[in-house]
Amino acid sequence: MTEEMNQIDVQVPEVGDVVKGIVTKVEDKHVDVEIINVKQSGIIPISELSSLHVEKASDVVKVDDELDLKVTKVEDDALILSKRAVDADRAWEDLEKKFETKEVFEAEVKDVVKGGLVVDIGVRGFIPASLVEAHFVEDFTDYKGKTLSLLVVELDRDKNRVILSHRAVVESEQANKKQELLQSLEVGSVLDGKVQRLTDFGAFVDIGGIDGLVHISQLSHSHVEKPSDVVEEGQEVKVKVLSVDRDNERISLSIKDTLPGPWNQIGEKVKPGDVLEGTVQRLVSFGAFVEILPGVEGLVHISQISNKHIGTPHEVLEEGQTVKVKVLDVNENEERISLSMRELEETPKADQEDYRQYQAKEETSTGFQLGDLIGDKLNKLK
């Protein structure tokens, strides 16, 4: 800033001098001022009040306002003055410092124009639409009158060009918050989150400034075909932190671990002797795993599949088949349930007939009947 701009006690002002004036009258298109220590009065044309377009002078100043003004023309009866020129000189110096130090400052949005927002910071500052927010904004109408935190991203005094960014400030704050959150996260902690987006392999959940992944296997205790079957974008959920990779900024989360497990209080839901309907989930050499409740599987040992001898479970069962089973045993601590299909089978009539014929042959070959044997035993006890 020049020495002339700091000089306020000027007896005979010249063009370029800076003087102090007090507003005495506000007209629509100009402002009358009394210049301190100068006999001549001053006039500020409406075009010299601000770097922005002004409809009425009263929108910028009022009577008794004390202003620093630059002399732009000396006439016999009055000095022609500019508030805009003083504001601009000071603004450029201030903006150059802010640009060098990357200082964040605040300014009010004065106008919404095609392509962005306009602020008055002593000079006209422009915020392109792409630099307003970190997210897409369709309509900027509501931004007029808002105060935004800004960063100077481009400055050219010769071209009177000032480009500002609110997005840069937001992204910087988000990055700082993200790092703070990454450092504070603890494995095992349960947090509130919001589902941001769904993929084939899971759901990304915002836990307060950073997204973590809930893998599809961690969405539910039961099998999930696709994430959209369980959660939707925008849904608020509770998640448990499974792991934190601070170097790569990756967080693994689980919704499943915050929900009651399917084995929780299973002893009250399933008891020995219960007959249930289930679905064969897996066949192994030693039996079949049957889902009897969502997320709860029991084992039908190969010896409990059929009254008939079978070599492998595949001979009589297939995955996805619906079967009836009887509960033999429930071990809640080890999450094991023993089931039987054999106990629900009826003994084939052919087998019953074979047994009767066998019994008759035995009685004939020994020369006495079962009843005689029992009778003899009873007589010996008398």
UniProtKB/Swiss-Prot annotation:
InterPro entries with a match to the protein in the record: NA-bd_OB-fold, Ribos_protein_bS1-like, Ribosomal_protein_S1-like, S1_domain
Domain of life, per lineage: Bacteria
Pfam families documented for this protein: S1 (PF00575)
GO cellular component, one term: cytosolic small ribosomal subunit
Post-translational modification Phosphoserine, affected residues: S243
BP-aspect Gene Ontology terms: translation
GO terms assigned for molecular function: mRNA binding; structural constituent of ribosome
Domain S1 motif stretches: 16-84, 102-167, 188-256, 273-342
Task performed by this protein: Plays a role in sporulation. Cannot be expressed in wild-type E.coli, does not complement an E.coli rpsA deletion.
Name of the protein in its database record: Small ribosomal subunit protein bS1 homolog
Protein source organism: Bacillus subtilis (strain 168)
Gene designation: ypfD
